[in-house]
A protein has these predicted regions:
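A generic structural signal for residues embedded in beta-strands
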Residues: 148-149, 391-392, 518-521
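Short, well-ordered loop/turn sites that connect or cap secondary structure elements
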Residues: 140-141, 383, 399, 513
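Short alpha-helix capping/helix-loop boundary micro-motifs
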Residues: 126-136, 368-379, 502-508
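Assembly/oligomerization scaffold segments
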Residues: 14-197, 251, 371
Length: 719
């Protein structure tokens, strides 16, 4: 049965249904008037109708039953016609059907559809529908799976499965209500969640898999033929999951397309034309093929555009500052256009040679992805991105080869499915598509990266039980307030560089931010993948040293003892009249001066050593005291002089020994006085003066000699 006949039968069924309803209403009225006795008063005992009565041996209730049976028959006829329209047991020609959610397959008839699809973009399928049900429940359809099937003579040509992203109820006519449905792939769900998060030491396949699993998208295939190394630090920043994946795949030269089977849409990620399989074979048949049963290409054009001919990318990495980090790539078709059209970009978004070379090649292939393209049209629903089509029967033999479909747009019309469309013609299908060489590596165009709008606040983090956590470059790990996945530990971020007031080759200033400190983070080029700590701040939990505002005149450099309560400090007090420089060492203090050191104190100088002091002077020491000097030694005092020792006193010198004094001279002891030398011990006195007179006084004199005793003098007087 033809589609037009199906529709005619459907409309007849609706008419019969309406008449059945009217008859049923009349029968009910008659039954009520007769008080439920039927037509007994209008019949004779033989059961024949009296003159002027209803024909037939039925009472009022019987008539109602017949009307109800007519209503049921009309409904069944309508359902049968709908089933035939949806592709019944004997379909013929081109047909479109749709199933959605758990609804019965005959719920909808397709009036028209438009399908747009392309490399690295979620397909969009808009379907016009009609249904005998005027009140389809939206929750039964929205966010549920739906499948559009295109059949030719009852054989499936292609089916497209996705999720219902939009559902709209339209006008209700005599027998039908119109609906509009938009179907998107499961991947489209990623457009609905915006996020900010950090991925560390992961390659792009791992990142993509993680995000898609969070959306319960598991029909994923990776067909990657080129290396895609791990990324040390990769940030999704205030962008949807979809925008993040689009950006990353574009950077890595990865494109994707969809495959449909068993009521599923599988997203395939690829990076080489070799991952695109062969598809349909299409003959070239010029003219209008929208209603022809055999798929064919009716129109075909080709075009070339001037595009950048070479790409140069440059970047920088602090781990190898001498590395030029510069890569170039040129197009191969040097006769097609001028070669000096160059695309130069900095930063190139790479930090190693593997990424640098690949990104440069990917960028050139992306910028030239439409330099040479073909455009075609026909009625082939099987033409789709991710499948090659092979052209045949073209008068140019070189065109009869496989081609790679980049994008396609299909539109189908089934006007006879509408209750008002019986005179609008039969089912039609039209396809427009673009294509490139089958061995060309198509790449998605580069996308802008999110830009961080100014500095941010973050907290220094590390492993439990540690206070300082850094690497050989003095980098630290941070917990950003927007990172919901970080656990404020040593895995919360990658190693992040810290600016210092002074930095050189083995010299400069170094202050490592400690765990728990709040820091100010900026981003190189506004790139969320390149954070750098530029400052530190106090807050309510980390208060400044001293007691503000009372100590507002002080400037302090105070550290904190690692896993302790002490500190080292250099303090400047700038209060007028109380200016002071204070140095506090929690334990040891070492000072090393390679040449001279001068210290000048204009008032008093006091030094206190609680324990011992050692002073070692390898050369000479000179000490000058303009007034008095007092040395007090609590216990012993020892002075050792390696050679000569001279003491010069301008006026007087006195020495007092409480108990004993011993003087030992190895050879000669010489004492010279200008006037008098006097030795006293109790009642004994020895006095020598400059005139040569020697006086010895004592109570008793005792001379003992082991040898001779000689006394020589001018006069010797012995009393």
């Amino acid at each position: 049965m033809s589609m037009k006949k199906h529709l005619t039968k459907l409309q007849q069924g609706h008419a019969l249904l309406e008449k059945g309803k009217q008859a049923g209403d009349l029968a009910k009225q008659a039954t009520n008037l007769l008080g439920g006795a039927g037509t007994a008063g209008m019949m004779d005992k033989g059961g024949l109708m009296k003159p002027g009565g209803f024909a037939g041996p039925l009472g009022g209730q019987g008539l109602a039953q017949q009307a109800a049976a007519g209503h049921s028959g009309a409904a069944k006829a309508l359902q049968k016609a709908g089933q035939q329209l949806m592709g019944g047991s004997t379909p013929s020609g081109l047909q479109f059907t749709l199933t959605a959610g758990e609804l019965a397959p005959e719920t909808f008839v397709v009036t028209d559809f438009t399908l747009t699809e392309g490399f690295s973009q979620p397909f969009s399928l808009s379907v016009g529908l009609a249904s005998a049900d005027p009140a389809i429940d939206f929750p039964a359809v929205l966010d549920r799976a739906a499948t559009l099937t295109i059949l030719q003579d009852g054989v499936e040509s292609r089916s497209i499965t996705g999720m219902v992203a939009r559902f709209e109820q339209g006008d209700t006519g005599l027998h039908q209500t119109t609906y509009q449905m938009t179907i998107r792939p499961d991947l489209w769900r990623t457009t609905l969640r915006q996020n900010s998060r950090i991925f560390q030491q992961q390659d792009i396949e791992t990142i993509i898999t993680t995000i898609l699993k969070e959306h319960n998208i598991r029909d994923v295939v990776f067909s990657l033929r080129h290396p895609h190394p791990e990324r040390e630090f990769c940030v999704q920043y205030q962008e949807s999951d979809f925008a993040f994946l689009q950006r990353l795949t574009a950077e890595e030269g990865i494109f994707y397309f969809f495959e449909y089977s068993n009521g599923r849409n599988t997203v395939v990620f690829a990076d080489d034309s070799g991952s695109v399989p062969l598809g349909i074979v299409l003959p070239y048949q010029p003219g209008d093929t929208s209603t022809i049963g055999e798929p064919a290409v009716s129109h075909m054009t080709s075009s070339a555009q001037v595009r950048p001919a070479q790409v140069e990318l440059k970047d920088y990495t602090f781990k190898n500052p001498a590395w030029s980090a510069e890569f170039k790539e040129k197009m191969k078709e040097d006769t097609l256009q001028e070669m000096y059209y160059e695309h130069y970009d900095y930063p190139g978004r790479f930090k190693d040679e593997v990424h640098g070379k690949a990104f440069t090649r990917y960028r050139l292939e992306a910028l030239r992805n439409d330099a040479m393209t073909g455009q075609g049209s026909g009625n082939a629903i099987a033409v789709q991105p991710g499948k090659l089509f092979t052209l045949t029967n073209h008068p140019r033999a070189d065109l009869n080869q496989p081609w790679q479909v980049v994008s396609a747009s299909h539109s189908g019309s089934q006007p006879q499915a509408r209750e008002t469309g019986s005179g609008e013609g039969g089912t039609t299908l039209h396809s427009d598509f673009s294509f490139i060489q089958h061995n060309q590596n198509w790449r998605p165009s580069p996308l802008p990266k999110p830009v961080v709008d100014g500095p941010q606040i973050a907290k220094v983090v590390g492993p439990a039980g540690e206070e300082i956590f850094c690497d050989q470059y003095g980098r630290v790990r941070l917990q950003f307030p927007w990172d919901r996945y970080g656990q404020s530990n040593d895995q919360s971020s990658c190693w992040i560089r810290v600016t210092q007031p002074w930095a050189g080759q083995g010299w400069g200033m170094l202050a490592i931010p400690r765990i728990g400190q709040e820091v100010v983070v900026d981003f190189l080029h506004g790139d969320p993948d390149q954070p750098i700590v530029t400052g530190r701040t106090y807050h309510a939990s980390n208060i400044p040293p001293g007691g503000l505002p009372g100590s507002k005149t002080q400037m302090a450099f105070r550290s904190k003892t690692h896993k302790g309560e002490g500190y080292n400090e250099l303090l400047f007090e700038d209060a007028k009249g109380s200016e002071q420089l204070s140095l506090h060492a929690q334990k040891d203090m070492n000072t090393k001066v390679l040449n001279n050191r001068d210290t000048k104190v204009l008032a008093n100088h006091t030094e206190t050593v609680d324990k011992n002091q050692t002073l070692h002077i390898k050369g000479h020491q000179m000490s000058t005291v303009n007034l008095t000097r007092t040395d007090t030694v609590g216990l012993g005092y020892a002075l050792t002089v390696g050679a000569a020792m001279n003491t010069a006193v301008a006026l007087s010198q006195s020495e007092q020994v409480g108990v004993h004094k011993s003087v030992i001279v190895g050879n000669t002891l010489s004492i010279t006085a200008g006037d008098v030398i006097e030795l006293k011990c109790g009642a004994s006195t020895l006095r020598m003066d400059s005139s040569g007179k020697i006086t010895i006084q004592g109570t008793e004199f005792k001379f003992e000699a082991s040898g001779p005793v000689q006394i020589t003098g001018k006069d010797i007087d012995l009393n």
